A protein has these predicted regions:
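N-terminal secretory signal peptides that target proteins for export/translocation
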Residues: 1-9
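Non-catalytic pre-domain segments flanking phosphatase-related domains
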Residues: 2, 13-14, 24-82, 265
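C-terminal cap/substrate-recognition subdomain and adjoining C-terminal extension
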Residues: 31-36, 146, 150-265
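Second-shell loop/turn segments in exported
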Residues: 48-57, 111-119, 140-146, 178-185
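Short, acidic loop-to-helix structural element flanking the phosphoryl-transfer center
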Residues: 112-140, 146-153
Length: 265
């Protein structure tokens, strides 16, 4: 038979054990920290993009809908206009690295990330681009990455195994003129100038070789716009966009992907 003192000793041990467990739990390093550095909690937005099952489901669903809306075969001059970041390339690793170190966005750190050419593909985009190419289509990647980084963007895209060539794909980053054009007739957001140049056959593709330049020197017809931001759609801004007016085109000509990490909002 156990003595009262024995019960007391056991109770003390249990309390000590529980206390140690609590202390250990409180002092353990969160999984979001980098080795040897102070731990920082990731935002819900980054956790959603990098860890949730909902994000790849939604992204893949949008691209499946876009595939269903593609023509059986593209007509001469038809083109799909796409954004790059969080539309084709997934930069959540950059966001995660910055937040893990208690840092936010900076133009220098972003440029350094782009130069690493390590962004992965947004779920569903590979199948979509495969279908565009199979149907004799073309893609214009109108990105607000600085135009001086276009070569790195192109290299990153090719490294991901996408079936892109200088004939079927045009990469065009932003320059000062794109922002300066806003407010001029027909120029509502800072991608509208490049969209207009595309339709006029005046688009300046950074990745286009001399042999392929003639394929982009003719006027093009934009049949679909895909992005993660409402301003990836021509003629609207976050402030001016009328969702009710846009909805008849959503699912046929306009496709918007989820991006909780950043945006014009």
């Amino acid at each position: 038979m156990l003595s009262v003192n024995k019960f007391t000793d056991i109770s003390k041990l249990a309390c000590i054990s529980a206390a140690v467990s609590v202390i250990a739990a409180c002092s353990s390093t969160p999984s979001t920290s980098l080795a040897g550095e102070k731990a920082h909690t990731l935002s819900n937005a980054v956790l959603y993009q990098t860890s949730s099952k909902e994000y790849p489901v939604l992204s893949s669903f949008v691209y499946n809908q876009a595939i269903a809306a593609l023509p059986t075969r593209f007509a001469e001059g038809d083109v799909v206009v796409m954004d790059v970041d969080e539309t084709v390339l997934d930069n959540s690793t950059y966001q995660k690295e910055r937040e893990s170190n208690g840092l936010g966005y900076s133009s220098k750190s972003w440029a350094d990330w782009v130069k690493r050419e390590e962004a992965t593909l947004v779920p569903g985009v590979a199948d979509f681009i495969d279908e565009v190419v199979k149907r004799n289509g073309k893609v214009a990647l109108i990105t607000n990455r600085d135009k001086t980084l276009d070569n790195h963007t192109w290299a990153n895209l090719l490294a991901q195994g996408l079936p892109l060539t200088t004939s079927n794909t045009c990469v065009v980053g932003r320059i000062a003129a794109d922002k300066e054009a806003v407010g001029q007739e027909g120029m509502v957001n800072d991608k509208d100038l490049r969209r207009t140049q595309l339709t006029q056959g005046k688009i300046a593709c950074s990745n286009t070789s001399k042999d392929a330049s003639s394929t982009w020197a003719a006027p093009h017809t934009i049949i679909m716009q895909i992005g993660d931001n409402i301003e990836d759609v021509g003629g609207v801004t976050q402030e001016s966009a009328n969702v009710d007016s846009l909805m008849p085109q959503v699912g046929t000509e306009i496709f918007i992907l989820p991006n909780p990490m950043y945006g014009s909002w």
